[in-house]
Amino acid sequence: MKIIRKNKKDKERREIYKQAEKMKNMYKMLRRNELLDQETRNYFNMKVTSSEKNSSISRIKNRCVETGRSRGIISAYRISRLRFREYMKMGLISGVKKISY
């Protein structure tokens, strides 16, 4: 299967976020700690603000793992609504069927 460039980029961002998350949360906690002096809190504030852009969770975009489409993603399956519909019609997704009245 062909690797989609946007999915590769998104995967890299997820890895960067995963690595930086613990340290960033620790710095955030320490900068809010009122028991520390202001200079120390400013230091931790600087550490949080100077962190890499891609280490932010807001840079992560949900994408279809097959097509790379960024809109209309069914979160539980991580595929686009178009692929979901295709797979549903073929019966590849168990427990899901088309609604009829």
UniProtKB/Swiss-Prot annotation:
GO aspect biological process, one term: translation
InterPro entries with a match to the protein in the record: Ribosomal_uS14
Chain coiled-coil ranges: none
Any Pfam family the entry gives: Ribosomal_S14
Keywords, alphabetical: Mitochondrion, Ribonucleoprotein, Ribosomal protein
Major subcellular location class: mitochondrion
Protein name stated in the entry: Small ribosomal subunit protein uS14m
Native species: Dictyostelium discoideum (Social amoeba)
